[in-house]
A protein has these predicted regions:
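Conserved class I S-adenosyl-L-methionine
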Residues: 73-85, 209-236
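Class I S-adenosyl-L-methionine-dependent methyltransferase module
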Residues: 95, 99-159
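A short acidic, Gly/Pro-enriched loop at the edge of an enzyme's catalytic core
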Residues: 166-179
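A short beta-strand submotif of the Rossmann-like class I SAM-dependent methyltransferase core
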Residues: 181-184
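A short glycine-rich, Lys/Arg-flanked "PGG" loop and its adjoining helix->strand segment in the class I
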Residues: 194-206
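Acceptor-substrate binding/catalytic loop of class I
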Residues: 241-256
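A C-terminal cap/extension of S-adenosyl-L-methionine-dependent methyltransferases
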Residues: 261-264, 270-328
Length: 328
């Protein structure tokens, strides 16, 4: 039985290697990354899956901000960093706060293509069903179903900065009550991540909240669900740099303790580190080793895996919640 289990794991690895080889080739062909994104966003409709996911997870975020962080959202300025190509974030922020939010992105603005789907998703979500917005906000969003992305930003009074450098952001000091990102920080090299956290500390008001969902999983897990989700941590740094250092696959591979240390170094106060476990796909405040499956087989212990605690080896992602101290 033990041998069969190892053979099954080896087959998963070989499948993942095949996917990684394809992405490596695409990343190094001129125009390859652009063509790859065109295929995934167009033919494979990946952004519609993103919209469905955002519709599912944002109500939970809103509850956490209110209940765990003690942040009343009405009238607050919500900043979403790297919202992606769908205009879900400005609609959700407006529904929750009733005032214009802020978007920052290293790429361009949201696409017109996904406006109607985003509007419908917001109106059908728990955010609207729970009465999070008054009728005026609800009606204003409903009227945008046939609009373009620019009209969405205008109607919700959302400010946007594109082509930004995350280490030097064009936002005013002390101007935001909540900064949120999802699936972004793990793509930053450690020095860039540290600089972004310093910038966000500057931009947040005293008492404001930093909310970042950091996916600790190997990116190949998104390509093949059978891939051991922490296997990238087993690779030597030099090998990882050569094989996965390109834009389609790079992950900074920081351990949870290393991520927390970066928040601490800036001056943030920790509220919670909610661990996301599989296969149940739920957050736990503790006991991840008992609640979730392991990200690699127990017998694998090479590379950066030595930096992980038992809890870390059973953690797929973490929702890091921090506060800027009132006196800062």
């Amino acid at each position: 039985m033990h041998r069969a289990r190892r053979l099954h794991s080896l087959c998963d690895v070989l499948r993942g290697v095949a996917h990684a080889s394809l992405l490596f080739a695409v990343a190094h062909v001129p125009g390859g990354p652009r063509a790859y994104h065109a295929v995934t966003r167009g033919l494979l409709r990946s952004q519609h899956r993103v919209i469905r996911k955002l519709r599912r997870v944002w109500p939970g975020y809103a509850r956490v901000w209110r209940e765990r962080c003690g942040l009343e959202l009405d009238g607050r300025t919500i900043w979403v960093h790297e919202p992606g190509w769908v205009p879900f974030a400005p609609l959700a922020s407006y529904l929750l706060s009733g005032r214009g939010g802020v978007l920052t992105s290293a790429a361009g603005p949201p696409s017109d293509r996904y406006v109607a789907a985003s509007v419908r998703a917001i109106l059908e979500s728990e955010l609207a069903a729970e009465g999070a917005a008054d009728p005026v906000r609800h009606a204003r969003i409903a009227a945008l179903v046939d609009a373009d992305a620019a009209a969405v930003l205008s109607a919700t009074s959302t400010a946007i900065a594109t082509k930004v450098d995350p280490s030097s952001l064009p936002l005013d000091t002390g101007s935001v009550d909540l900064c949120h990102s999802g699936g972004t920080l793990e793509h930053y090299r450690p020095e860039v991540l540290a600089a972004f956290l310093r910038e966000s500390f500057r931009i947040l008001r005293p008492g404001a909240v930093a909310s970042h969902v950091y996916d600790h999983r190997d990116h190949l897990r998104h390509v093949d669900g059978r891939w051991p989700f922490l296997l990238h941590m087993a690779l030597p740094d030099d090998v990882y740099r050569v094989l996965f250092g390109h834009g389609l696959m790079f992950h900074n591979r920081l351990a949870p303790a290393e991520v927390m240390a970066l928040f601490d170094a800036v001056g943030f106060e920790r509220i919670a580190a909610r661990r996301f476990v599989l296969p149940d796909k739920r957050y736990v405040d503790g006991g991840a080793a008992e609640a979730g499956e392991a990200g690699v087989p127990r017998w694998v212990g090479s590379g950066r895996l030595a930096r992980l605690s038992v809890e870390d080896r059973h953690t797929a992602a973490i929702h890091y919640l921090y506060r800027k101290p009132e006196r800062s």
